[in-house]
């Protein structure tokens, strides 16, 4: 495979730094104590925009493939898009958002009870801890969601793991 073919085959939404756009809401959650609620809400808009872009991309990739019937094509496009919406919603938004939110909440609680840090310093410490946590949760959550979907939703529509398809 040539370098150009490798680049074309690479999933830009899951195998490049663009993947971190799906984690915009985690950044928002980490900054929750320092910013207005509208900023946190906007971070969710960015994350769901990423989910939508990846889902459209996966649907279009399936659409341009050759299928034996239009019914099969419609089914395959729908499955590709829905599978991506489910995967990205859980792996990029819901689970990591909850994880960072709770991590920051309990970090703040711990710092309040165990230190005498000024409020502003405590908030910045919690934010930094939340941001530092993000890179460590990406791959475990991605793997968990992949496995969970293989055991649940993908059995319903009888499709192999999307990332393992050719």
From Swiss-Prot:
<dbReference type="GO" id="GO:0005743">
    <property type="term" value="C:mitochondrial inner membrane"/>
</dbReference>
<keyword id="KW-0812">Transmembrane</keyword>
<keyword id="KW-0496">Mitochondrion</keyword>
<keyword id="KW-0999">Mitochondrion inner membrane</keyword>
<keyword id="KW-0053">Apoptosis</keyword>
<keyword id="KW-1133">Transmembrane helix</keyword>
<feature type="transmembrane region" description="Helical">
    <location>
        <begin position="33"/>
        <end position="53"/>
    </location>
</feature>
<dbReference type="InterPro" id="IPR019560">
    <property type="entry name" value="Mitochondrial_18_kDa_protein"/>
</dbReference>
<dbReference type="GO" id="GO:0006915">
    <property type="term" value="P:apoptotic process"/>
</dbReference>
<protein>
    <recommendedName>
        <fullName>Mitochondrial fission process protein 1</fullName>
    </recommendedName>
</protein>
<dbReference type="GO" id="GO:0005739">
    <property type="term" value="C:mitochondrion"/>
</dbReference>
<keyword id="KW-0472">Membrane</keyword>
<dbReference type="Pfam" id="PF10558">
    <property type="entry name" value="MTP18"/>
</dbReference>
<feature type="transmembrane region" description="Helical">
    <location>
        <begin position="78"/>
        <end position="98"/>
    </location>
</feature>
<comment type="similarity">
    <text>Belongs to the MTFP1 family.</text>
</comment>
<feature type="transmembrane region" description="Helical">
    <location>
        <begin position="125"/>
        <end position="145"/>
    </location>
</feature>
<dbReference type="GO" id="GO:0000266">
    <property type="term" value="P:mitochondrial fission"/>
</dbReference>
<comment type="function">
    <text>Involved in the mitochondrial division probably by regulating membrane fission. Loss-of-function leads to apoptosis.</text>
</comment>
């Amino acid at each position: 495979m040539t370098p150009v073919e490798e680049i074309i085959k690479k999933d830009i939404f899951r195998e490049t730094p663009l993947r971190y756009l799906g984690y915009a809401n985690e950044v928002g959650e980490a900054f929750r104590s320092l910013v207005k609620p509208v900023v946190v809400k906007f971070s969710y808009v960015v994350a769901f925009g990423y989910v939508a872009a990846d889902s459209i991309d996966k649907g279009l990739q399936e659409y341009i493939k050759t299928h034996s019937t239009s019914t099969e094509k419609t089914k395959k496009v729908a499955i590709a898009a829905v599978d991506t919406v489910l995967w990205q919603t859980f792996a990029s938004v819901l689970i990591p958002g909850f994880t960072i939110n709770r991590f920051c909440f309990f970090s703040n609680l711990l710092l309040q009870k165990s230190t005498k840090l000024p409020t502003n310093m405590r908030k910045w410490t919690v934010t930094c801890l939340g941001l530092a946590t993000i890179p460590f949760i990406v791959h475990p959550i991605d793997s968990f969601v992949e496995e969970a979907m293989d055991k649940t939703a993908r059995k319903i529509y009888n499709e192999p793991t999307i990332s393992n398809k050719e």
